[in-house]
A protein has these predicted regions:
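NAD(P)H-binding glycine-rich loop region in Rossmannoid oxidoreductase-like domains
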Residues: 51-89
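A conserved pocket-lining segment of Rossmann-fold NAD(P)-dependent short-chain dehydrogenase/reductase
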Residues: 79, 157-167, 174-200, 222
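Conserved beta-loop-beta element that borders a ligand/cofactor-binding pocket
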Residues: 109-110, 141-164
Length: 336
């Protein structure tokens, strides 16, 4: 049994990961700022804390055998709101972790580091990050591999579906967003559509990580289940949920990522096999909508960009409006 500190463990990935880590017999402690949540409801030890508060975080590193570092500002638009804060959270904290913690490090990166490429890319493929988010993840990878080459890094495909029943669901991810638009609006705009994305059910992040908590595998692994075009994903959604019309828009779109990724290494070396599918993700999100759990797609809570804007761009908040501003972001949010 290992003592596992899940940093940033109260979010979209962390909920299901925490459950599966406990089920595997490990002792779990979650450290999280609760940026997107009002309270933590799971029955594991929880510490409310900021990843930029190194003095507060340090004793919990001393306790842990393994750290799963989920804490990050995630997504291209959200990270672009305030590059300075993004770098502090997504890169500088990783440098500090590698210099401070002597145990096992498991770090989720992103397949977005590949950018735009027509080839099927393995872990040795050329990287071409097209956003601040991807640049930061690639730099964090470099820091880890330089300082702690015994660590394990997973480059995650685009996630989809529902994790656990407690944690906030992200509806700004392509599958979840298109299902929501099909069910609530009946109209799916697809810009271009021929661009490829690697896909992975959010629960399968835990499928990959949990067996490696007390293992010794190291290096960088692509983690995903399939590659498909945005247009094909939209067509699957319309057919599966029985709602929505697709509009193909042949105009330039700000997201120029286009890449197909090989998952052979993670299967061959770590024995990873996905337990969930994109169709499972479609069904889960459709069920939430059908049962009234998701009604208003304009709510900021569903989007990292809209949730983070009040904290990263405080000058844009109308006068007289009070916001709950976590101290890490209020302290560091300033000129961009």
């Amino acid at each position: 049994m290992a003592r596992v500190l899940v940093v940033g463990g109260a979010g979209y990935i962390g909920g299901w990961l925490t459950d599966k880590t406990v089920e595997a017999g490990h002792e779990v402690r979650v450290y999280d700022l609760l940026l997107y949540e009002e309270r933590y409801l799971k029955g594991v030890e929880f510490v409310a804390g900021d990843v930029l508060d190194f003095e507060r975080l340090h004793p919990h590193l001393d306790w842990a055998d393994t750290v799963v570092w989920l804490a990050a500002l995630v997504g291209d638009p959200a990270c672009a709101l305030n590059p300075g804060v993004t770098r502090k959270i997504n890169v500088d904290t990783i440098d500090w972790l590698c210099r401070t913690f002597e145990g096992r490090i498991i770090f989720p990166s992103t397949c977005s580091v590949y950018g735009a490429n027509d080839e099927l890319l393995d872990e040795n493929g050329a990287t071409e990050p097209l956003s601040l988010y991807a640049e930061g993840k690639l730099e964090a990878e470099s820091v880890i591999m330089r300082r702690r080459p015994d660590s394990l890094i997973f480059r995650l495909a685009t996630l989809a579906g529902v994790g656990d029943s407690y944690s906030r669901i992200r509806m700004d991810l392509v599958v979840n967003l298109l299902v929501m638009r099909a069910k609530l609006v009946g109209h799916l705009q697809v810009f271009g559509g021929e661009q490829y994305r690697p896909m992975l059910h959010v629960r399968d992040v835990a499928t990959a990580i949990v067996p490696q908590i007390d293992g010794d595998a190291s290096g960088i692994f692509n983690l995903g289940a399939e590659n498909d075009t945005i247009a094909a994903i939209a067509e699957r959604i319309v057919e599966r949920v029985g709602a929505g019309e697709i509009e193909r828009v042949d105009v330039p779109f700000q997201d120029t990522r286009n890449y197909k990724v090989s998952f052979d290494r993670v299967e061959q070396e770590l024995g990873f096999k996905p337990e969930f599918t994109v169709d499972d993700a479609i069904d889960q999100v459709a069920w939430l909508i059908d049962n009234g759990r998701v009604k208003d797609m304009s709510l900021a809570t569903f989007s990292n960009l809209h949730s983070l804007r009040p904290y990263l761009c405080p000058e844009e908040i109308p006068l007289g409006r009070e916001i709950r501003r976590p101290h890490s972001l209020s302290r560091h949010a300033g000129p961009r």
